[in-house]
Each structure stands twice: as structure tokens, then as C-alpha cells.
Amino acid sequence: MEEYELREIALQEGGSNLDINTPPNYDNPVGDGSSPPDSPDIQKSENQFKNVERELEIDSKQYLAGHDAENNHDENDEDFKLRRYFENSQRMALGNGQKPKKMGVSIRNLTVVGRGADQSVIADMSTPFISFFNLFKPSTWKEKGSTFDILHDITLFNRDGGMLLVLGRPGSGCSTLLRLISNQRGSYVEVKGDIKYGGIPAKEWKRYQGESIYTPEEDTHHPTLTVRQTLDFALKCKTIHNRLPDEKKRTYRQKIFDLLLGMFGIVHQADTIVGNEFIRGLSGGERKRLTITEAMVSSASITCYDCSTRGLDAASALDYAKSIRIMSDTLDKTTIASFYQASDSIYNLFDNVAIIEKGRLIYFGPGNKAKQYFIDLGFDCEPRKSTPDFLTGVTNPQERIIRQGFEGRVPETSADFEAAWRNSSMYRDMLEEQKEYERKIEIEQPAVDFIQEVKAEKSRTTPKRSIYTTSYITQVKALIVRNSQIIWGDKFSLISRYLSVFTQSFVYGSIFFQMEKTIPGLFTRGGAIFSAILFNAFLSEAELPLTMYGRRILQKQRSYAMYRPSALHIAQIVTDIPLTMIQVFLFSIVVYFMFGLQYNAGKFFIFCFTLVGATLATTNLFRVFGNFSPSLYISQNVMNVILIFMITYCGYTIPKPKMHPWFAWFYWANPFSYAFKALMANEFGDLSFDCHDTAIPFDPKNPTRYDNDYRVCASPGAVEGILSVEGKDYLDQYLHFRSDDLTQNVFITYLWWVLFTAMNMFAMEYFDWTGGGYSHKVYKKGKAPKMNDAEEEKKQNQIVANATSKMKDTLKMRGGIFTWQNINYTVPVKGGKRLLLDNVEGWIKPGQMTALMGSSGAGKTTLLDVLAKRKTMGEVQGKCFLNGKPLEIDFERITGYVEQMDVHNPGLTVREALRFSAKLRQEPSVSLEEKFDYVEHVLEMMEMKHLGDALIGTLETGVGISVEERKRLTIGVELVAKPHILFLDEPTSGLDAQSSYNIVKFIRKLADAGMPLVCTIHQPSSVLFEHFDRILLLAKGGKTVYFGDIGERSKTLTSYFERYGVRPCTESENPAEYILEATGAGVHGKSDVNWPETWKQSPELQEIERELAALEAAGPSSTEDHGKPREFATSVWYQTIEVYKRLNLIWWRDPFYTYGSFIQSALAGLIIGFTFWSLQGSSSDMNQRVFFIFEALILGILLIFVVLPQFIMQKEYFKRDFASKFYSWFPFAISIVVVELPFITVSGTIFFFCSFWTAGLNTEYNDINFYFWFIFILFLYFCVSFGQAVAAICFNMFLAHTLIPLLIVFLFLFCGVMVIPSSIPTFWRGWVYHLNPCRYFMEGIVTNVLKHTDVKCTSEDFTHFTNPEAVNGVTCKQYFPISEPLTGYVEAINEGDESKCGYCLYNNGEEYYNTLGWSFDNRWRNLALIICFWIFNTLMVITFVYITRKPRR
């Protein structure tokens, strides 16, 4: 097989005469201080080295300074400079003793087995029941589902420094092959066969993980980082140790940074944030270039690029491929790339090509022989059809052309193609060449030099067997900087968090303002300290979604061997420390002194230090559940149960002696308990609490009646005759811990933080919930297609063939003439405004397809956003008309817009998503049957019939359809709406040639039927380009280069450019690539002609302006009047029904969310029920009953955090739907509130049955039982709607988690439990207390539970005092008669002994709640008020959904 046969022809440039593949003959490692045998003259070598260094420096400056200059050099000159730069870099490296890491790949008999689609079905709420009952069905025990071969018996190889192009249609197995070459095997059932890397077996190759990397199709980056920050981080993690002499790390990183940004033309975007589908940032093409650049930073020996030209224009894609070619030639980098669409220019840069169909290898060999091989098999290639399109097209019955005389003899199925290949002489030659290559590997042993060089690249402190280049501490430092940048990148949320904390601290401080050192202040002071811990715990809830977010980025960078996952957690906790310290200090500096805690600097700093430890421990605990859990909802619900445990067993709500033994162990396994004990000891250890005015006995009418020697404080720790209680005695007797253990408890609090840190590090190292990047499909039960079945393959081919033939030429579309004039679009930037569209004008007419082209970043997507009325930011100037009239309210509805980002609701199947679009966007006069028939037609045309019942899913979880299939679904969603005008933003990006052809052919039919449409397209083949009638070509800055007809065989278009001095376009050349080259598109493209200015002076523009003036003067066209324009196709009532049905289906299919709340309620109910097991009628049990209800209140409040992520996610999908006018804001808002109700009802009922009777609250009054259940359910309705209202306001999860604690502080602090109503400051009691729904919940349910409860104090509950008048026959009751305002009763402790008396605080439950100012008579009023609060929250949801209904773009 010829090696690198097409290199010089493809690149058309010269190279260096230096043989860079021959390393210097050094026997000793570089840097050991010795010289090799027969070493040359040292001085002479140093002089030569310095000469090369100076030459490299000159070349570097020329390249790095000149890559972005305009109108100076032609394209080949730019390639020459890049080649020369790399060659000189390699010469210097060789002179420094470095050796190229030349590693090829040899694959033999590779078979990859995947799970069949029938192995798992779409999970829903019935799944657990079915699984349970299947345990009792022996017939199901052995049913494990089918498997299939994703790849079947693949044998090929790629030499070191070689470039292998892998071609195949989507689903053929190209991505799997690339993953296996990069040694990513985790997601597959079985991998059979042999892969060797330069002779190193795959098992051993794991030690060199970062030396073979896989760059996935999707672009995964932190959206708030800039390009500079993203690449700088990668460079810090991959900076090699054996750099050039005296070259500093910073210099090395800057050199590589400048080089790569110059190579890929993103120099001007260096300080632009990356962005994503929800955050504005880089364009799609620029983001793709960043992905490629990041992969190159890894400096891997073998790089696998999966569809890496997706989103790039043809010129940029060619520049990228040329850069890869040069790097492969000069640096001996081995490249394997998979492209769905590639031009001949790109194709010719590769040495070999492998073609895969349905997992089978049907060709492997030189690229220049592949076309002839298939022609010899009996296939023919159309004129102007690119070689890659032809090679993939031969496997498609609808695309391939059979040569005359070969009918019935050509292969039909993938198995036929594989058999033909294996029977060919080329296959036998390939096997011989592979054997020869493997023998060469055995002789030359490149692995020896490779291993030595890998070791030399590692930093001195990096273990030699480590897969990482830099040391652990270096990784941590880089991650600390990146984490800080991510946090500061969202500075609005950070500042909002601190402002929220500071604001809330005043609320907390005012509630417990200047607590008195009296007996009532004992419990209140403990409540203040407890609330300080609880406040920071609620803030830590934000860590759960943040832990889940970024898993895919971690998985990618982990595969690049950038850093250990545990290093990421170390960096997180390092950045946590200052942020937490600031947070706690802002909180403490206010509350400590407002609380009236001891004015002692040491105690203040102990308070802060302990709170910091408790907050850090809680934050890490939340991360533990996030890292050990596959789902946010699982971790959220489990964490809520644990949080209830921690709150209950910290020692505040239940003192340690009152804890039942079955759960008392959690007191010792609870970070909160140690923090609480430390803070209590810090405050109470040397305090005394006075009780002169409240000591027992006490006569309100005659305060001096009783002798103080016989009075006692009504508090644990009291001593008769001493009218004060020592804080340390209170801690000892009531809470059962010593104040001397302060230091120990602080230390243990931090020890928990360390333990949780270790658990997180373990989880991040050994758990990967992303599925390794492999997307696994799940189907409805019984709907999974058969895999690797020849008959099924023929059936699918026939479906597509029938769909193609059924495309009706008589389709009737309601199109119109859409014109736009003088469109300018500016956006605010730092220091002024930036013009993104500059005076763009044009039109689209029925029956015409207009192509919108230009280099990446030229403003194509921006123009479509403006024309489709999707822009909500910036300033738009200019005029748009439809049929001569200004755009009306129904424009967005009748317009189809296929956006670049594929945003779909993951809980639906493909067919359900399409039907939903058809039902809500097609005219209501069209029957449902006709709408569904059209959906099936589109499914067939999009080659998605077999995916109709597949779950859309998400890429993050690895469950759902692939990236390419999502793109097809995006197009289908718009097509089924039968729009009047169609805008398509890169509809063929990421699709193979045949899929692209089918889509373009389909929209060509729509155009022929009368639909006007405009389509941005990056890499059109000649065949695709011929389907378009007109073209609008943009240059950077949104300037028009050309707008007009393309003409037959593109003659009108090409003649325009030839008129101004561009070379003629050849017959075999792709006109789309020709015009991009002519106008200087691409990374390094340049042109001597100022095309925007040329266009302004051209006669074509004058003709365009005359035509636009004529269209405007003609006025509204006499089209059929269809009545008053409607913003939405269907009524609000119909929309509401359909949206509710969809949301209900999504909730039904999310058992993690629904069953998670059920399980949370059950566990919480059992925990709370058994914690307050069988409460009796003692005085202390009155308190326990109230705290039982308080725990139920906390459960409801915690539900707020559970609904946040679901609502925010669904709101993003709603914004996308609303922009296309699927449905109004009201149906979504009311549906998402109502859909929760049945699930909340079940959750509340579960809690009721698990806790009510367990805690001993059963009474013979059924109305009391019913009331408890009813008001609790309504309270849960309120809590969920409250969380939804907050989520409707906030635009991201972090902000919502910042705002929630500020609001819930008013809920639980002002409910009347932690601070009794009479003690609440007048300012708050006057309005917040009365506006707090939790107050009405507590009043209603407490009075309901305690109404018929009599109190009988135990010996421990009594306040003991001596009756000195007992010797005179005075009984206890006579000695201390109870009179208002006192409550309770007095009796002798021991029957017959009236000298020892006891005072019980209450006679019955009514006396208890009367002291709070509550009344049983208000219970139905309270219930009604909770309903009112719930309705108010619902109105807030509706209001804020309306206000935030439009996405920021």
C-alpha cells in the first residue's frame, strides 16, 4: 500500500529536506549530565542549536503575527508558514533530545457488542411494579434482552503519522470505532479482538490514557469561561517538562496558545465567553474550532475526531484538515477522523479511508483507490459528486447508481458488501501490509522511545506510572484558578448570594434581637444558634445541581488525562473555603451582635470558625450524594431525608435523653450535632440565666409572698434557692453534654468535612454516570427494532424508498413573498456597540430556495434570528414585509425555524414530539388523522421511522437518540407544522450525505409546492448546491457579498466573481467551495478584492433595490383572506389540554422524580413517626407533638428544592416552544402547576399514613384525622407552588438556590415555633407573622392535634420545689394556687408527702396553644387561608412565566 501518496499533491507545498523521522543517535537520556558516545563538538552543537532557535523564533513571529493579517498572502503561503513553523519546532525538539511519539494503531478482528434496544424500555411509574411481579415469573428470570454487534470483525491499521478517514452513514459504527481506538470501552457489553498501539496491547495502553483521545461530535465546555480561560486551563494541565532550554512554562503556554488560535482563526474571540444553547457566546462554528483546539492542546499521539467539521464552513473545514495534515507530517501525529460530509479537497488529504456500513468494514485502503474499487463492483458516480459522497452513497439503495450490466449482481446489504470486500485482492493485500507493518513494529520497537518520551514529558513530581503529564498539585492549582473563573464568570449570582446572605442576617438578627439572659431566653438562645446552622445548610443545597452539572465536561477532560477527578474536588473545596468564610462572616458579623451573644472576640471567632466548618461539611455532604447518584432527583430526595435526620437529631428539637434507641445512633453520626454542641458550649459555658421574676412558686398579685430560699427556676439545671441557672448545668442536665468538650466538638465538625471530602474524591475517581459518551436508545415496550437483521435492513431501505416516491408534486403550500430591507443589528459591548448586520437586504419568493452562506461568524444565524423575529436583545433596524404588508402577530407561528441548537424535551419519544408540533401548529381545520399521517410521512422522509418510539433523552445521561438524530428531529418538528415560510439554520450539519440529500430534496419539494425558504448551509456538495435557486453570501461583519440567482450549473453566480478577476470555476469544482475561496472565507482565507464594497457598486445591487422598491410599491398581494391573524393556531383551552397531557406523560416517565418524592415522604414519615414514637400526654410530649408537626413543615419546605430543577428545565423547553408559537404562556403555567397535584397528594398521603399513627396521634375523632391530612396536603400544594414561583422568576438554578433561603427564612422562623408569637419583634409580628402561611398551617394543625389532649406530667416534667408550710397542714395546691396568667397545675410529688411539690406547666393541650395566641376555632379559616396562599403562588407562577416567556438572545 502506498504510504502518504497524496500529501504533496493535496497540500501543493514544499517541505523541509530534514528527515524528522530520524532521531539523533543518543544512547543516554537527555539531561543526565553525560554526553553520548562519539558526541559532536559541544560548542558547535550549541551554536547550531542557537541558530535553529533564532530561526524558529523568526518563523514563530512571522506566523503568529501574520496569520490574521488581511490581503497579504495567499492560502498556500499560510500553509507553508505553518509547515515551516512545525518543522523548525520539531528540529529544535530533536536537538533538545526529544523524540517524536510515533505510535500507529493495528486492529484485528475487532467486534464490539452492544445492548439490544429490547434490553431496556422507557421507564415509567409502572416499571417498578412490573419488575417486582416479574420476580415471581420464572419465565422472565433468564430474559436479559438481545445484544447486537455494533462493530463486526473489523481489521485495519494506521501507521504512525498517518491520517485515516472513517466514512459511514449515521449509526454505522464510526463513532464506536473511534472510541475503541481511543481505548474507551466502558459502555459496551463486550469487546472482542485485538488493538495494539505501536505494539502495546490495549490493556497496557490504559497507562497512557491521554495519548489516544476521542473528540466527540458535540461541543462540551463550561459556558461562562472565555476561550482564553478554557485553553489556558488545558495548557496548564498538559505543559510538558522537557521543554526547550530556558523556556518558561508561561512562555511555552503562550506560544502554543497563540499558535492554535491563529491556526483556527479565533484570535479575536479569545476573550469571548464560550456560551451554549442557553447562554449567548461563540457561534456554533467558533465553538467547534475551540473543541478541536482543546483536543490539540492535549498533545496526544493518536487523536480521533468524530464529525469535527460539523458547524464549520467548507473553507474553514479545509483549513482545519490541512492543519491536521501538516501536524501529522511534521510531528508524526496519528489522526483518525470521521466525517459525515467531506469535500474532495479534504478527502485527498487523508492517506487511507475506511468505510463502515452497519458495523461492517466494506473497504479499507488508499483513498485514491476507493472510488475505483466500488466502480469495479458495479456502481457509477454522478458528475460533480464528491468521492466521499459516492463512497457512502453506494450503501444506500435510494442513492446508488448501478452500472449497466451489473443489475442484480451488486451487493445489497452490509453483509454482502463485507463479503465482497473480503473476497477482493485489495483485502488480501491489506492483510499482507498489516503483517509487514506489525513486523516493522516488532523490529523497530517504537514503544521504547514512546515510553521514554512520555516519562520525560511528565513533571518531576509526577509518578512515572501516572497517566497524567503534570503533578497532582499542579492540576489542583489549575483547577482552583478555573473554578474561580467559573464562579466569577457568573458574578451576578455570586454577588446576589452575598447580598442575600447579608440581607437575611438582619432578618435573623431582628427576630432574636438582644435576647435576655433569662430562663425564657435559654430555649430561644438555643433556637437562634440552631437557626444559624440551618440557614447555611439551606444555602448548601445549591451544590446538588452544580455537582450534577459538568459531569460530561469532567468525563471528556478525564479521557484527555488532563487531571485526576479527585483533584477537581480538592480545587472545589479550596475555592469553597474563602467563599464560605466570606458568607459566614457576612452572616455572623450581623447576627452575632444582634442576637446579643457574648461580646468576646474569642467567642465571636469560635462562632464563625464553627459555622464555617459546619457549612463546609454540609456542602461536601450534598456533593457526596450528588457524586454517588445517577440522578439529581434521587440525590435531592435522599438528601432531604438525611437533612430531616440531621435537623431532628442535632440535639435541639429532641434532647439526647429523649431520643429513642433505634435512631439515637444518628446523633453521633451527625455533623450538625457537633456544631450545635460546640456553639452552645461556646455561648452557654460561662453564662448565668436569671429567673427572679419567673421562679416557682410565684404569685403574680404578690411577688414577694414566697421566700426565695424555697423558690426554684423552672428550667433544667436549676437548684432550689438559687434564682439563676448556670449555662453549663443546663447543657449537662438537659442536653447531656459538657461545655468543656468545645474544642473536641469543633475538631469533629471539621473531621466530618474531611471524611466527606474523602468520600467525594473516591466517588469522583470510581463512578462515571455519563455513560462514557455512548448514547443508548430506549424504546416503548415492544417497539424496539431488530438489530443487525438483513431482512429488517431491507425493510427499512424500502420504507425510505417508498417515502421518496410518495413525495407529492401536488403539495399545496400557502407561501408568500417575504422581503427585508436595510437590516442592521447592533448589540451592546464593553465600550460601545458592535454592528453584526450591516444593511442586509433581499427577499424569498414562493417556489424558490435561497442559500445563506458565508464563513463562520459572518452573521448567518444572526440574520435568521432577526428575520424570524427571535432576537430579544440588541437593536434591530430595517423593514420586513410579507406579501407587501408589515409582519403581523401570526408571523412566528406561520414561520418554521430550524435552529442550530437542538433543544427537545427529553421525556418524549420522537413520534410524540412530532405529533405535538403538528397538533398545535397546523390549522385546527385539519383533521387529527391527517396531521398524524403527515407526521408518519415526515418520519419516513427523515429516515426516522425506526426511531419513532425511541425516547429523545439527553446526551448527558447517555440515554436517548444521538446528536445526528437530534438534528433530524429538529428539522422534522418544523416540517410537520407545514409553515408558510421556512428558515433553516444549518439543517444538514452533522448529517451524512444521503440524509442531507433527502432533507434538501424534501425541502425542494416544499419550495416547488409554493413555500419560500432560506437555508444556511456550510458545506454543501455540488449536488446539494444545485437544488438552490438563489444565494445570499455574507462576509464577516454581516456585510453582503452577493445576493442573486445561482443560475444553471451556477454560471450566473460564478460569472459575477470571474468578472472581478477571480480565476474561472472548473467544471469539476464545487461552486460553493469556489465562492468561499474567492471571497477569502476560512481560517486563513484572504482576498485581494473588497467584496462588500464591490457589491455596493455593482449593477446587481441596483437591480435588487429596484426589485425591492417594486415589491414595496405593489403593496399587499391579493391573496385569499383567511380572517384576522391569530398568534396561535389553536385555542387556549385546546393548548392547555395538550400541554397538560404532555407534562403528565413526562412526569409519568420520570420515576426518579415522582417515586423519589414518594420514597422521600415514606422515609421521612417513618423517621419522624418513629422519632416521636407513641407520644403520651406529658408536658414534654406536648412540645414533642409540636416539633413533630414542625418536622412535617420542614419536609414541605424541602420540597421547594425538589421542584426547582424540574421547573427550570421545563421552562427552557417552553421558551423554545413559545418562540415558535406552539402554545401560549398561560397553558404552560397552569399545566405545570396542576400536573404536580396528584403526585403531591400521593406523597402527602404516604407521609400521613407512615407518621400519624406511629407518633401516637390517633384519636377517636375522625374529623381531626381528616383535617390533619387535608391541611397537610394543601400545605404541600403551597410549598410546591412557592418553589415554582421562585423558579419562574430566576433564569438559572444557582440564582434560585440563592433566593430560596432568603424567602424560606420567613416561612419557618415566623411560624410560631422557634420563636413564640409574643416574642417576635413588633415590626415583624405586625405583618410578616400574619402573612406567613406556615403560621396558619401550624396553628390549624397544632390546635387540631392538641384540642382533646389532657396533660399528665411525669416526674421529669415537674418543676420540683419545697413546701415549707406542709408542717402546718398546707397542701401543695394550697401553698401554690394557680391563677391567671399562669397555667398548669400543682401536686405532691409523692402521694401523702405535701412537703415536696411539683409544678406542671399545662393542664391540657388547649392551655398550651392558648399561650401562643392560637385558637381551635380558627382551624377552617386557617385552611382557607392556605388555599388562598396557594392560589396566590399560582398567580405568581403565571405572572412570571409571562414576564420571562422570551429567551434572552
UniProtKB/Swiss-Prot annotation:
Binding site residues for ATP: 854-861
Record protein name field: ABC transporter G family member 21
Family of the protein in this entry: Belongs to the ABC transporter superfamily. ABCG family. PDR (TC 3.A.1.205) subfamily.
Keyword Transport appears in the UniProt entry: yes
Alphabetical list of Gene3D superfamilies matching this protein: P-loop containing nucleotide triphosphate hydrolases (3.40.50.300)
SUPFAM superfamilies: P-loop containing nucleoside triphosphate hydrolases
Keywords: ATP-binding, Membrane, Nucleotide-binding, Repeat, Transmembrane, Transmembrane helix, Transport
Transmembrane segments: 519-539, 577-597, 602-622, 634-654, 747-767, 1155-1175, 1188-1208, 1228-1248, 1266-1286, 1296-1316, 1423-1443
Location of this chain's protein in the cell: Membrane
Membrane topology: Multi-pass membrane protein
Superkingdom field: Eukaryota
Biased composition (Basic and acidic residues): 1-10
PROSITE patterns referenced in this protein's UniProt entry, alphabetically: ABC_TRANSPORTER_2 (PS50893)
GO terms, molecular function: ABC-type transporter activity; ATP binding; ATP hydrolysis activity; ATPase-coupled transmembrane transporter activity
Domain ABC transporter: 130-383, 818-1062
SMART domains on file: AAA
